[in-house]
Amino acid sequence: MATTKGFDCNKESKIKRIALSIQYQGSNFSGWQRQKVGHTIQAILEDAIFSLDSSKPAKVVAAGRTDAGVHAAGQVVHFDSFGPIPVHRWPSALNGRLPEAIRVRDSVEQSLDWHACHSAVYRRYRYIIYNGCTPNLFLNPWTWHKYQYQLDEELMEEAAKGLIGMHDFSAFQRSGSNRTHAFTTIQEVKLVRHGDLLVFDIQASGFLYGMVRLLVGQLVSIGEHRLSINDFETRWKLKLRSEVKEAAPARGLCFIRAGYKESIFRENIVFDSFPGFLLLTNDPPERII
């Protein structure tokens, strides 16, 4: 009789929709979405699931499709399980087969009409800028070191606040998107300085391809007093994509979480993990370095 790590693979089981909370350090991956060429989170996760439940090829759906080099602290995914593995055993079973840069934090069963992407009411990203004058080896994998100027965070936040609401954000959409429109609703933005770190949080119903990195690139130009708020508003309100040129590096961006009408994972699962002081806490300490 076939078994997988103590699970009877011949035992009849109902279809179960499994939701996972996962984290990954995105530096060495070609983004979330499976590709013909490239090392992607989706492909690795689907292969690991199939190695445990080979009754049907796994199809994993994510709340947000992160680009190459982007990290995730609280990515939410789902897949349908046809095998006998108990829901609570999926994290340990998968973590034994995944690379250390991908970790499964929690698993719960959802109804078959629940969808990690379509059921989400918001996604939240965080971008970290290290505005210190000297390089920091330990911050480099998680931040954009930007120090030609001391950034003016008050101007940056003022510009960002003007984005709140539902708008056409074509100016912040990279080419290659298959979306039929560029409307989305930004629900919240926040930019806070903690010593030499600028922490930019943005929450929206959804994000366009490359949107956050293009937006942060513009905000940094404002913080350096190279771009006025009026010119920034003209660019995005008139959808002048050709004027939005510099994208912030992927390494400073982290998918913090997706939100749903009802909480699905244990409380604070996203916010109790390393590097909590940098990426995953609501209120970083006043002095970090």
UniProtKB/Swiss-Prot annotation:
> Which keywords fit this entry according to its UniProt record?
Isomerase, tRNA processing
Q: Where does substrate bind?
A: 125
Q: Which domain of life is it from?
A: Bacteria
Catalysed reactions, semicolon-separated: uridine(38/39/40) in tRNA = pseudouridine(38/39/40) in tRNA
Q: Which GO terms describe its biological process?
A: tRNA pseudouridine synthesis
UniProt entry tagged with the keyword Isomerase: yes
Q: Where is the active site?
A: 67
Q: What is its EC number?
A: 5.4.99.12
tRNA processing as a keyword of this entry, yes or no, is yes
List the Gene Ontology MF annotations in alphabetical order. Answer: RNA binding; tRNA pseudouridine(38-40) synthase activity
InterPro entries, sorted: PsdUridine_synth_cat_dom_sf, PsdUridine_synth_TruA, PsdUridine_synth_TruA_a/b_dom, PsdUridine_synth_TruA_C, TruA/RsuA/RluB/E/F_N
Q: Which CDD domains match?
A: PseudoU_synth_EcTruA
Q: Please give the Gene3D superfamilies that the UniProt record associates with this protein.
A: Pseudouridine synthase I, catalytic domain, C-terminal subdomain, Pseudouridine synthase I, catalytic domain, N-terminal subdomain
Protein role = Formation of pseudouridine at positions 38, 39 and 40 in the anticodon stem and loop of transfer RNAs.
Note the subunit structure. Homodimer.
The cross-references to HAMAP family, in alphabetical order and at most eight, read: TruA (MF_00171)
Similarity-based family: Belongs to the tRNA pseudouridine synthase TruA family.
Q: What is this protein called?
A: tRNA pseudouridine synthase A
Source organism (scientific name): Prochlorococcus marinus (strain SARG / CCMP1375 / SS120)
Q: What is the lineage of its organism?
A: Bacteria, Bacillati, Cyanobacteriota, Cyanophyceae, Synechococcales
